[in-house]
Curated annotation (Swiss-Prot):
Major site of localization recorded for this protein: mitochondrion
Key words of the record: Cytoplasm, Methyltransferase, Mitochondrion, Nucleus, S-adenosyl-L-methionine, Transferase, tRNA processing
Family: Belongs to the class I-like SAM-binding methyltransferase superfamily. TRM5/TYW2 family.
Record's GO cellular component terms: mitochondrial matrix; nucleus
UniProt-annotated location(s): Mitochondrion matrix; Nucleus; Cytoplasm
Binding site for S-adenosyl-L-methionine: 428, 466-467, 495-496, 530
Biased composition regions of type Basic and acidic residues, renumbered to the chain: 679-689
Name recorded for this polypeptide: tRNA (guanine(37)-N(1))-methyltransferase
Region (Disordered): 1-20, 205-244, 652-689
Coiled-coil spans in chain: none
Organism of provenance: Leishmania infantum
Length: 689
């Protein structure tokens, strides 16, 4: 299904790049500056969970403290951010100072030398050193301490500077208390900031083995010995923080941080740029499906005027995405692909005219690096022979062909021309894990091979079919891409009923003399029918002849036309050895259900389309695969054909002296009534996507 490069609507669209300027802002944070650098391990461990966290914003910075009285000597740029704070004057223990110090980014200061650390000594130094030289600056989360909370009176903050304090095991607790109280009395520090410094001092003084506070998993602090703290010991593999027993010089300063669009998550950006409060119908996007480099969204009518902005936000926040598409209509095609619009495109290669950016090395097919397989080149060459072929459409096809990894396999997915659902990855793995070497897999609706390719890679002999010729071609591409052994995956392009009536019939009954030479089933045969909207309807090929008057659509049909559908499984050739028939073939059929009893409803859908009741011993497993909608579930029924079916098939063999039992009335325990078949067909039609 062709994808459009852009939408033509009556509504005007906002320029996609304009949102970036709209989210620019500046936030002022409280920052803790400390030295020596050797105390970083201990301090950062204590501050874990308390630092400012924002994308693309460093919360721990290297800075160099210099005397303000130097007049900025040695700084080449007048626009440098300078933070000023007080250093304790000589002989003044309370921290009041007559000397100012400034801090500038470390990378911008040349020739600065570190002041010698106070050392790992337990004795209190005679006089703390000035906070000068290389330091660390930690940006604090506003929930811990705001910039406006550094001083008691935020209105007079411009006239205040925070003193330098000496903390740690080398400083007596009484001295620290004296420093903090003096700063509080002088209005140079708020009580909240003083409490934080007091906590830092206590944690540094006691060391890692006797810390009085322990962090919970959510970053909150719990008293030592509390039930939550005692119940959550550190994991054995975690590293204990290094202790630091020297003095640490610290101070606070406000720090202005400029935030641009790179600082926000995708959901935050969308909430900021979309007028959610102005339009009740406009809700925040919950996410998107990613298929290789393609992001797929389902936009409502209210979102469409902002489609380009949404596409650009997704590109900006997800480096692995280069194309964003919007699903335009519901899936209605017989091939199960859907119409889509391209609403976001990363500037690498123009998807329409093929103009590449500088330095891009594209081959004649428009593929970077010449990574196409021989089968894929053949598929593209065949497309070029079509009377409706156009270069623009071919470029779109290449742009929307993704490479996906699942089960340790690589899949080339022409996303705009086949059906692919990444949410079924777990189900693909679950089913393939049930198979092994010697088994056979008959995949009736195989797509590009999410079941078939990994099964073949495990040594399973695979016969895979899809009605979509593009899907069938790309199964061959994926077989080559994953270096599958020759003939391990045989690909068919036919209707699913024809596949069941020919390939599966010949294999199960051995009706044909060596239909596939060299393929011998020493394990179990599996049949997958993963098209939940209509897969159960294909089971009508197994119905007894008396049940063929109701078509799959619930409308009465011509008896001779209906007989064609299930004639093969009601007439066993005379040369077939009944003992050679494989009656253990396991079917895995998918369907949708909105019933309260999901399991019963799923089994009943199988029975009414099959035309037989399934005894409990024939139902190996029934499970819910995933939620499709609030009241709709995807189900999988794994079963073998019941004894009544095989009795009916054997009775149809020429020379048995009786007609197929399905041609006559049968008990309700064996055959499902035709009226139920018609009702189930109507229900299945309602459940379609």
């Amino acid at each position: 299904m062709p994808a459009k490069q852009s939408r033509s609507t009556a509504e005007s669209r906002t320029a996609p790049h304009s949102y970036r300027e709209r989210v620019n802002s500046t936030v002022e944070l409280a920052a803790l500056v400390y030295r020596p650098l050797t105390a970083s391990g201990a301090l950062l461990s204590i501050l874990r969970g308390k630092l400012y966290r924002r994308r693309s914003v460093r919360n721990v910075l290297d800075v160099v403290a210099v005397h303000s009285i130097s007049g900025g000597q040695g700084h080449s740029a007048e626009s440098k951010v300078r933070v000023e704070y007080l250093a304790p004057a000589e002989g003044n223990a309370n921290g009041n100072s007559i000397s100012n110090i400034g801090a500038a980014p470390c990378a911008d200061i040349q020739g600065s030398s570190d002041i010698a650390a106070t050392g790992n000594s337990l004795s209190t130094p005679a006089q703390p050193a000035l906070l000068e030289g290389r330091c660390k600056m930690c940006l604090l989360d506003p929930t811990v301490l705001k910039a406006t909370e550094l001083w008691p009176d935020p209105a007079s903050a411009a006239q205040h500077r925070v003193p330098v304090f000496s903390l740690g095991a080398a400083i007596a607790g009484s001295h620290v208390t004296q420093q903090l109280e003096a700063a509080l009395q002088a209005g140079q520090l708020s009580r909240k900031a003083a409490d934080l410094l007091q906590q830092l001092h206590e944690r540094l003084s006691r060391g890692p083995s006797s810390v009085s506070l322990t962090e919970d998993r959510d970053g909150s602090e719990q008293p030592q010995g509390s039930p939550r703290a005692a119940a959550a010991p550190p994991p054995p593999s975690s590293k204990r923080r290094a202790s630091y027993t020297g003095a640490v010089e610290v101070t606070f300063t406000p720090r202005a941080v400029e935030l641009n669009y790179q600082a926000y998550t995708m959901s935050e950006l969308l909430s900021m740029v979309l007028p959610l409060r102005e339009h009740a119908d406009l809700v925040a996007l919950s996410g998107f499906e990613q298929v290789g480099h393609i992001a797929h969204v389902n936009l409502s009518a209210a979102h469409l005027p902002y489609a380009d902005i949404i596409g650009q936000v997704i590109l900006d926040c997800n480096e692995t995405v280069s194309v964003v598409v919007n699903k335009v209509d519901a899936i209605s095609s017989v091939f199960r692909e859907f119409k889509m619009d391209i609403i976001g495109l990363r500037c690498r290669t123009d998807g329409v005219d093929g103009n590449a950016v500088a330095g891009a090395d594209l081959d004649e097919f428009g593929e970077a690096g010449g990574s196409l397989t021989a089968a894929e080149r053949q598929a593209i060459a065949l497309e070029a022979l079509s009377p409706t072929y156009s270069l623009a459409e071919a470029r779109i096809h290449r742009l929307l062909t993704a490479t996906v990894r699942q089960h340790g396999c690589s899949f080339r997915v022409p996303y705009n021309r086949v059906y692919w659902n990444s949410r079924l990855s777990f189900e693909h793995t679950r089913l393939v894990d049930r198979m092994g070497p010697g088994d056979m897999l008959f995949d009736v609706m195989a797509g590009v091979g999410p079941f078939a390719v990994p099964a073949a890679k495990k040594g399973v002999q695979v016969f895979a079919n899809d009605l979509n010729p593009v899907a069938a071609q790309y199964m061959k591409v994926n077989a080559e891409l994953n270096h599958l052994p020759a003939n391990s995956l045989r690909v068919f392009n036919m209707d699913g009923r024809d596949f069941l009536n020919s390939v599966l019939f010949d294999s199960v009954t051995r009706a044909a003399d060596a239909p596939f030479p060299g393929h011998l089933c020493t394990g179990r045969r599996h049949v997958t029918m993963n098209l939940p909207a209509i897969a159960v309807e294909f089971l009508d090929v197994f119905q007894p002849l008396s049940s063929t008057c109701a078509s799959a659509s619930g409308q009465q049909c011509n008896a001779s036309a209906a007989a064609i559908v299930n004639e093969r499984w009601n007439h066993l050739p005379a040369h077939v050895d009944p003992n050679a028939i494989d009656r253990c073939t396991l079917f895995h059929v998918y369907c949708f259900s909105a019933a309260e009893d999901l399991i019963t409803d799923a089994v009943r859908q199988v029975e009414v389309n099959l035309g037989y009741t399934l005894p409990p011993e024939n139902i190996e497993e029934t499970l819910m695969v995933r939620d499709v909608a609030p009241t709709k579930r995807m189900m999988c029924v794994s079963f073998t054909l019941p004894p009544a079916f095989w009795e009916n098939l054997l009775a149809s063999r020429p020379g048995q002296g009786e007609e197929p039992r399905g041609a006559h009335a049968e008990t309700a325990s064996t055959l499902v009534e035709e009226e139920e078949v018609e009702q189930a067909a109507k229900k299945a039609k309602t459940d379609k996507m």
